[in-house]
Structures are given as C-alpha cells and as structure tokens.
C-alpha cells in the first residue's frame, strides 16, 4: 500500500439534496432469486454462507430500483446475481486466460441463442453446468417482459456483452506485478464500461415498458449522462474498495492508487482530487438533464414521461450505489482509509472463495 493515510470520510462526496430516494421495501425477490440459483446448482441452499453471499449481492437492487414492483425486481435480481457470480468466478485463481476467454464467449452466445447455442444444443439437460442453467433462466426472464419489444432485449444483451468483454482487458491492463498500474486515461476508458452502469440503467429497457423508442438508448446526450454517472460511481466505488483491492494485489485497478503514482501526491491530496472530479461529473449530469428534455420536447407526452422516468432512474442508481456500498459487507476492511468502511464485520463473506470451481 502507499503511505498509510489518516482516516477520511466519504461524506465529502457531493450529492444534490433533491437526489434523495427511499429504499425499496420489497424483499421477497432476494430469497426467490437465490432459490432459483439453488435449483440450477449455483449455490447450496443449506449453506448459510452461500445465502449470505447472494443476499449481499441481491440487496443492491432495492437501492438501485426504489420504484420497482416484485416482478421487475425479479428481473433486476436475476441480472445482478448472474453478473456478480460471473465476475467473481472469473477472478478465481484457477481461471487461466484460456478458460476466461472460453467462458466469456460461451455465455455471450447462450444469452443470444439460448438452448440453440452450439455450446448447449447437443447436450441433454442433465449435462448442463450450473452456470449454463442459470444463464438460460436469466435469458427467459429477460425475454418475458420484452417479448413485444425485442429491440429492447437486443439493446440490453448488447450492454451485458460489452460488460463481460471488459473484464479480461481490465485485469490485463494492470500489468504483471501488483504494483504496476495502467495509465489513468486507459483505466478510465475500460472502467467506464466495466463498472457496469450501462447495463444497470439498461435493466429498465427490459423490466419497464417506458414507451421510449429504442433509438433513445443511443442518444448522445443520454449516453454522455450515463458516462458521467459512471465516472462518479467509479470514483466512489474505488474509494470504498481501496483497501480490499490493495490487499488482493489489485492496486492497478483502482484510480486512487493509479493517481498516487501518476501525480506523486499523498493519498489525502489524491482523494481531494477525485472528490472534485466526482462533483463535476454530477454537475455535468444536471446540465445534460435540461438539455435532453429540451431537445426531445417534440416527443408525445407518453414518451416524454418515459424519458423523465429514466433520468430519475439514473439519479436513483447514483445515490443507491452510494447507500448500498456503505451498508454491504463486501467493502468493509480493517485497513480502509475511510471511517465508514473501516472495521471487521463478522458477516463478511469471502466472496472470491465461495464459488465452486465447476460452475461453468
């Protein structure tokens, strides 16, 4: 680790006062989504650590999507469970480069083609792996609410595949030694995709019939808003995960570490720098909110309401990410430089050790 910093507070991050949203009070989706994964063989239903892992992942949707009903939460939860399992699984020590590439190609194709994928088409159901089965469950859950909006399903699958094709480049970018680091500009480009905000926001394209035209998702103003929101979330998440990433030899994947090396500044000075960057990102989002509504003012009321819904959803995710990150045990660490995430939590589950090596 770089020089040991004094304890700082994450309260320095700026969030507009009007960006205040209650957590979703529905929780049934957590157990139901976990049970689906158990049926597929992803988890052992009798193992408390397995449920603790899943719960730590799935409760994020109650923060990200405060207005969702149960069925919409089930869509979001299936996505999040699949994403976290795949990401954590690919980080396992036994996963060689070849195995990682195979998994990425395989699950991309299953999402696109389902049971017709050449990876599965010749196999009996009993021969499918746990991750094969759960990917089919996810695909079915995505298709159900969007069966009459196939373009939105395609948009969302595009966001998912962009995300999981970014996993390996991010790992490779840090170099062969844990003290190596990628140039900040390269890191920012890859991490903007890898943070996953495009698919987290894109959940709305399948779970909610917003009535917006499919072309909205490539509107350059909207894309810029999501990019700035991703920047804010990257910075905040890199702060809360700083100690854990340093401890796991992932320093080269953290903007705080990269900037300490690049700028030759103390941790405290770098923290001030990134907090200001995050604040400016919020300001850019707010400016583009106004611009987006103005440029789309010609839309009929129903579609404009959908646009405004998505604008508010982006805010909810930015704020929800903060609130979830501060309550999940995933980021608690003895060496955290931040008051809010420092400590030893007995409920912490070592997620990188939970998953069975035969999932794929």
From Swiss-Prot:
Q: Which GO terms describe its biological process?
A: sorocarp stalk development; terpene biosynthetic process
UniProt keywords, alphabetically: Lyase, Metal-binding
GO molecular-function terms, A-Z? metal ion binding; sesquiterpene synthase activity; terpene synthase activity
Question: Does Phosphoprotein show up as a keyword for this record?
Answer: no
Q: Where is this motif: DDxx(x)D/E motif?
A: 87-92
Q: Where is this motif: NDxxSxxxD/E motif?
A: 237-245
Q: What is its EC number?
A: 4.2.3.-
- Domain of life the protein comes from: Eukaryota
Q: What class of enzyme is it?
A: lyase
Q: List the disulfide bonds.
A: none
Q: Does the keyword Lyase apply?
A: yes
Q: What does this protein do?
A: Terpene synthase that converts its substrate farnesyl diphosphate (FPP) into 2 yet unidentified sesquiterpenes.
Domain remark in the UniProt entry:
Contains several highly conserved motifs that are important for catalytic activity including the aspartate-rich 'DDxx(x)D/E' motif and the 'NDxxSxxxD/E' motif, both of which are involved in complexing metal ions to coordinate the binding of the isoprenyl diphosphate substrate in the active site.
| PANTHER family, per database record | TERPENE SYNTHASE (PTHR35201), TERPENE SYNTHASE 1-RELATED (PTHR35201:SF2)
Homology family:
Belongs to the terpene synthase family.
**Protein name as it appears in the record:** Terpene synthase 5
Q: What is the lineage of its organism?
A: Eukaryota, Amoebozoa, Evosea, Eumycetozoa, Dictyostelia
Record gene name: TPS5
């Amino acid at each position: 680790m770089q020089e040991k910093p004094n304890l700082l507070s994450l309260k320095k991050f700026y969030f507009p006062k009007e960006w205040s949203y209650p957590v979703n009070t529905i929780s049934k989706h957590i157990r139901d989504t976990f049970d689906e994964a158990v049926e597929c063989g992803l988890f052992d239903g009798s193992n408390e650590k397995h449920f603790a892992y899943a719960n730590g992942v799935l409760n994020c949707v109650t923060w990200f999507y405060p207005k969702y009903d149960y069925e919409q939460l089930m869509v979001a939860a299936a996505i999040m469970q699949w994403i976290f399992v795949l990401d954590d699984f690919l980080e396992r020590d036994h996963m060689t480069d070849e195995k990682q590439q195979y998994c990425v190609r395989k699950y991309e194709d299953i999402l696109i083609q389902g049971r017709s994928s050449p990876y599965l088409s010749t196999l009996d159901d009993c021969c499918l792996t746990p991750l094969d089965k759960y990917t089919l469950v996810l695909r079915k859950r995505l298709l159900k609410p969007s069966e009459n909006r196939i373009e939105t399903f395609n948009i969302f699958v595009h966001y998912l595949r962009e995300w999981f094709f970014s996993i390996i480049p991010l790992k490779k970018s840090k170099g062969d030694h844990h003290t190596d680091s990628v140039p900040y500009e390269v890191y920012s480009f890859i991490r903007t995709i890898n943070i996953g905000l495009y698919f987290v926001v894109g959940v709305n394209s399948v779970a909610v019939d917003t009535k917006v035209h499919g072309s909205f998702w490539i509107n350059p103003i909207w894309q810029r808003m999501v990019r700035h929101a991703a920047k804010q979330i990257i910075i905040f998440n890199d702060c809360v995960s700083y100690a854990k990433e340093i401890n796991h030899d992932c320093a080269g994947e953290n903007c705080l570490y990269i900037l300490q090396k690049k700028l030759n500044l103390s941790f405290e000075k770098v923290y001030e720098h990134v907090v200001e960057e995050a604040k400016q990102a919020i300001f850019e989002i707010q400016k583009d909110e106004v611009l987006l509504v103005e440029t789309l003012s010609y839309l009929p009321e129903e579609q404009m309401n959908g646009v405004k819904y998505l604008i508010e959803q982006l805010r909810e995710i930015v704020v929800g990410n903060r609130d979830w990150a501060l309550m999940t045990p995933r980021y608690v660490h003895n060496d955290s430089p931040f008051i809010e995430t420092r400590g030893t939590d007995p409920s912490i589950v070592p997620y990188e050790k939970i998953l069975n090596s035969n999932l794929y």
